[in-house]
Amino acid sequence: MALQQFGLIGLAVMGENLALNIERNGFSLTVYNRTAEKTEAFMADRAQGKNIVPAYSLEDFVASLERPRRILVMVKAGGPVDAVVEQLKPLLDPGDLIIDGGNSLFTDTERRVKDLEALGLGFMGMGVSGGEEGALNGPSLMPGGTQAAYEAVEPIVRSIAAQVDDGPCVTYIGPGGSGHYVKMVHNGIEYGDMQLIAEAYDLLKSVAGLNASELHDVFAAWNKTPELDSFLIEITADIFTKVDDLGTGQPLVELILDAAGQKGTGRWTVETALEIGVAIPTIIAAVNARILSSIKAERQAASEILSGPITEPFSGDRQAFIDSVRDALYCSKICSYAQGMALLAKASQVYNYGLNLGELARIWKGGCIIRAGFLNKIKQAYDADPTLANLLLAPEFRQTILDRQLAWRRVIAIAAERGIPVPAFSASLDYFDSYRRDRLPQNLTQAQRDYFGAHTYERTDRSGSFHAQWF
């Protein structure tokens, strides 16, 4: 039997879909799953008649692959990845390459790269975005590792990635754990996007009184605008058309429990931002919103005890309010992406990743969850100035916020007056106002620190560190 060009371990839905994508693009492959029943079911159904070979032991799996072997691992992050790597180590030869396509923590990837490098084996951490549909029809791929490792898989990843007007949605990210770092921040930005959209929905429903049909119309119209055209806005419009199929006749979205789950990448983004000193308040607000949503019973009890402001029904211009919410959403979105890109820029310096921020925006234009026309503007901003300190300083984004900030502020004020939480909208505006201020009140913070802890302070009128006798 001829040796296969590629190997894939892990046949959950993402693994199955990537296997089918790889085969459809002309590459033969062997698949393996820890449970033989899963492999048998895949071969009897979706892989039937395709150039895919099953293996029922890792020994047979490795023996079926041409050398140098290229093996994509699609298993749960953490211990399961380590277990697969440990099982593969004695079976592989120098020059073979393992690619982790899961949502692994970047520091785990850094460790695995070093461990396997000592054995002459390659290891790549590759972010894969796009969900089940993207895995099958073209995801956004973020491979990190050595340049040689990337070149070994480049023909395959370029073939299976989503294709946009300026090429496949994949690029060499950088060394070590950079691929998984970029995917982590991508997911953090995704958290921000989703929370901002949720807040816009809440405002339109709770203030303007829009029903599901009207909400569909608004989001569908927004999806046709250059600034908000995106996958997440598109699916939001679709969600409002879904009627419960259990006989209630109600919009399904209104019957879904308001307790959001999370798998950890948002929290990781927050943790690493704090570690390296980058402010990402919108993303932090999004993570906190999910945490607060999860304490449903506690919130229900609190709702019986803690009352908000008493307000009159909305009597303003409905369309004007809808337009203002759109402006607030877009301004907040700019700030959220500015935070994510600032985090990537700082991480690139700290970890020596050499990230190309414009290229990252390009590969997110297709296949991934945050794909949006707006990313073209981000790419153009970094192409025009690769050293751009913050997206807020790019001429187009600066002018957009200056033109729309009054509507943005008005929407947040209305939410506050009515007791409607808009943590991500508010955090975005606070970020903008803090970033544009020449002087912040942290001079008082420094005075306090020096008062109680003799931590010293710097002065505005002369250089050096100072300590005052406060008492």
Curated annotation (Swiss-Prot):
Pathway linked to the protein: Carbohydrate degradation; pentose phosphate pathway; D-ribulose 5-phosphate from D-glucose 6-phosphate (oxidative stage): step 3/3
Catalytic activity line of the entry: 6-phospho-D-gluconate + NADP(+) = D-ribulose 5-phosphate + CO2 + NADPH
Keyword NADP: yes
Family recorded in the similarity comment: Belongs to the 6-phosphogluconate dehydrogenase family.
Active site feature: 183 (proton acceptor), 190 (proton donor)
GO MF annotation: an example: phosphogluconate dehydrogenase (decarboxylating) activity
Phosphoprotein among keywords: no
Keywords: Gluconate utilization, NADP, Oxidoreductase, Pentose shunt
Binding residue positions for NADP(+): 10-15, 33-35, 75-77, 103
GO terms classed as biological process: D-gluconate metabolic process; organic acid catabolic process; pentose-phosphate shunt
Subunit architecture: Homodimer.
Residues that, per the record, bind substrate: 103, 129-131, 186-187, 191, 263, 290, 449, 455
EC number: 1.1.1.44
Function: Catalyzes the oxidative decarboxylation of 6-phosphogluconate to ribulose 5-phosphate and CO(2), with concomitant reduction of NADP to NADPH.
Record's protein name: 6-phosphogluconate dehydrogenase, decarboxylating
Gene3D superfamilies xref list: 6-Phosphogluconate Dehydrogenase, domain 3, N-(1-d-carboxylethyl)-l-norvaline Dehydrogenase, domain 2, NAD(P)-binding Rossmann-like Domain
